[in-house]
Amino acid sequence: MSTSPFNSRVAPMPHDDATAPVLHYAHDAAGAHDAADAAGAHDAADAAGTPPCAASRTARLRSLDAAHVWHPFTQMRDWMGSEPCIIDAADGNHLIDTDGNRYLDGVSSLWTNVHGHRHPHIDEAIRRQLDRVAHSTLLGLGGTPSIELAARLTAIAPAGLTRVFYSDSGSTAVEAALKIAFQYHRQAPEGDARRTRVMAFSNAYHGDTIGSVSLGGMSLFHGIYGPLLFDPVRAPAPHCYRCPADLRPETCGMACLGEVERLMRHHGHELCAVVVEPLVQGAAGMLVQPRGWLRGLRDLCDRHGVFMVADEVAVGFGKTGTMFACEQEGVVPDMLCLAKGITGGYLPLAATLVTEHIHDGFLGGYADFRTFFHGHTYTGNALACAAALASLDVFEEERTLETLRPRIERLATLLAPLNDLPHVGDIRRVGVMTGIELVADRETRTPYRPEERIGHRVTLEARRRGVIVRPLGDVMVLMPPLSITETELETLVHTVRGAIIAVTEHGADGGLWTKRPDGPDNPDKANTPDTPDGARTGETVV
């Protein structure tokens, strides 16, 4: 048994007061439990030949949603007892609900939207593609948009990544990389059949398929599936605010990388891949790696002959300030996983880029069976690839990365005063990716109790004020579209600041507690789930 200290569990301007003007966004239980009445009212309006008013339409949609839709990462008991925001339209960097309320999209629709909603160039590219073909399989056929996109992606990716394997989500991009690394070593002339294991990191999140969940290091999300999963070599990821070894970043000499080196010495001969989120572990609460850590990991992979898989699903396409996060440390991975922002946030598409060396390991005669027997029905979908090509056009024509730099600097300036708030423990940021960790006591870094649901309440309070954000436990995540203006940045940060003050200093709940026909006024206090220590950063908001 190792005695390494890293074996311990990692614990996971205007209107900045509690009386700020808010949207009239109610949170009671009536609409979600009267499906028949709401649907009947809608039918009666239809029968009378008059359109239902916006309120009736919203009530009907909420009722249907509560009756039929199972939302991801959402406790449906809470959801069905609320009146959720139903998004009906969008415009630029704003979302619009069925009642006509506008909300600034502060998390780019779960980290996907790049250039704003309804960008005319991307809209038109999809319309043009619709006039040709919406989808055609890549099994045995080529497709114009997927061919053009592969050429564009390899041209902008780190040098040496020459081949593109398409899929449809971040999870499947990582899953493909896992199977490629494993199969390569089972069949390639230069492969090593002993290399059957994968190194992954604490607090990692790589998706929701069984392979990607096996890599995950978040017990709240992944623990229950333990019997289904393979066992990776688990290495410590940097967590400077809550270092499990109780070290300080200015004096530790990157001890966590030293622990990775120790594990590599012991397990390197059996590893086919190391999978890492470069620069930032997003779903862990925007945990930022110290400068040089990623470069050091690349060097260790080279030394031990292990493929480095860079999961840039969350950080790719400009969110860290460069097209790809790896660029910031001069790192070229052996495989690069892309999704989310690849289509500008329009349509599901993913890609796994690999080197020519890896691709060559799958070449052989028909009877050699070195084929990569893997793929998805909608792989390389024509509409999605057309959107991705148009998004890359916008990057070039609008000089997105160049014009983003002053707004990144402005974001840093706007965030600085939040360090003075008594319940802000840590602010972590790379590019526009920002995590604001809220704590009960900043001196001791004591987290809030899970049943207080501080991050959830701040999110709802911000929504009442017209801004959409989504927490990771008690870490408030800001990740706006790259098209956000300086004025909108000010609105985003000032609104979140006001919501934090309202909740942590004045007790606002954002309309969280609701009177339910089948339960107490505050169901969370009556029915608080057991949350594993160190997993609180996994809690998300309905």
From Swiss-Prot:
Keywords from the UniProt entry: Aminotransferase, Biotin biosynthesis, Cytoplasm, Pyridoxal phosphate, S-adenosyl-L-methionine, Transferase
Biased composition range(s): Basic and acidic residues: 515-524
Subcellular compartments: Cytoplasm
Any one GO BP annotation for this protein: biotin biosynthetic process
CDD domains the record matches: OAT_like
Chief location category: cytoplasm
Pfam family, one: Aminotran_3
Gene3D superfamilies: Aspartate Aminotransferase, domain 1, Type I PLP-dependent aspartate aminotransferase-like (Major domain)
Record-listed E.C. numbers: 2.6.1.62
Listed cofactors: pyridoxal 5'-phosphate
Pathway annotation from the record: Cofactor biosynthesis; biotin biosynthesis; 7,8-diaminononanoate from 8-amino-7-oxononanoate (SAM route): step 1/1
Residues noted as binding pyridoxal 5'-phosphate in the record, renumbered to the chain: 170-171, 311
Record site: Participates in the substrate recognition with KAPA and in a stacking interaction with the adenine ring of SAM: 73
Name by which UniProt lists this protein: Adenosylmethionine-8-amino-7-oxononanoate aminotransferase
Lineage: Bacteria, Pseudomonadati, Thermodesulfobacteriota, Desulfovibrionia, Desulfovibrionales
